[in-house]
């Protein structure tokens, strides 16, 4: 790992739950229904695979959420968790750090980064079946359970999104994934899509990916 935060954002823990009624193996991504899937897994005794066991899978289903909505929701969740667990912290300072340093927590880490971490454990030939999160309620009906988290309001979203340098690039990275909903691609094919179809825009990002890959990927 490059730094201590890499072990938080790219943990050695990737989990996939089987949804046999839907012929899906769904990757657990925070703020993309992971709590609902964990509840279903525990309630119904569904199969849960992690890490090296993912090598046996021919495909994994990944639900991609609207990037801006997920970012706002994720930061909101992160800050409320901080307030709950560390009430001594100043909330304005916590907000500043969350906005200034972009991605300090997995709740709002770009979905592209979640796939990057998943790729460490998948077979090179495994297909990633990209799905629109708007269809998530077809496999889990309780995903609106907020687990005690109060929803953000328009003022919070505006304060978070305004003058947030560099954020749009990463939101666009996730939007490209969402635009691929319905496709089945290997990780290599996804990377090639980024680095060929969007060459000019993502030249810097592709170089960044290579640096991460050397330090994070096997």
Language-model-derived ranges and their functions:
Residues 1-67:
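PAPS-dependent sulfotransferase catalytic core
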Residues 13-17, 47-64, 68-216:
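PAPS-dependent sulfotransferase catalytic domain
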């Amino acid at each position: 790992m490059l730094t201590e935060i890499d072990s938080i954002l790219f943990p050695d823990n990737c989990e996939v739950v089987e949804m046999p009624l839907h012929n899906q193996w769904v990757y657990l991504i925070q703020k993309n229904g992971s709590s609902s899937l964990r509840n279903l897994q525990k309630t119904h005794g569904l199969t849960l695979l992690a890490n090296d066991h993912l090598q046996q899978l021919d495909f994994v289903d990944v639900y991609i959420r609207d990037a801006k909505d997920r970012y706002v929701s994720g930061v909101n969740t992160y800050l409320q968790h901080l307030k709950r667990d560390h009430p001594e912290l100043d909330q304005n300072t916590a907000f500043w750090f969350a906005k200034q340093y972009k991605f300090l927590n997995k709740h709002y880490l770009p979905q592209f980064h979640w796939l990057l971490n998943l790729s460490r454990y998948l077979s090179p030939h495994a297909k990633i079946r990209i799905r629109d999160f708007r269809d998530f309620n077809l496999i889990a009906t309780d995903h609106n359970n907020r687990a005690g988290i109060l929803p953000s309001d328009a003022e919070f979203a505006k304060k978070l999104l305004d003058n947030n340098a560099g954020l749009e690039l990463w939101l666009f990275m996730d939007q490209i994934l969402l635009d691929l909903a319905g496709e089945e691609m290997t990780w290599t094919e996804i990377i090639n899509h980024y680095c060929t179809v969007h060459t000019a825009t993502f030249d810097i990002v592709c170089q960044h990916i290579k640096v991460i890959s050397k330090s994070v990927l096997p």
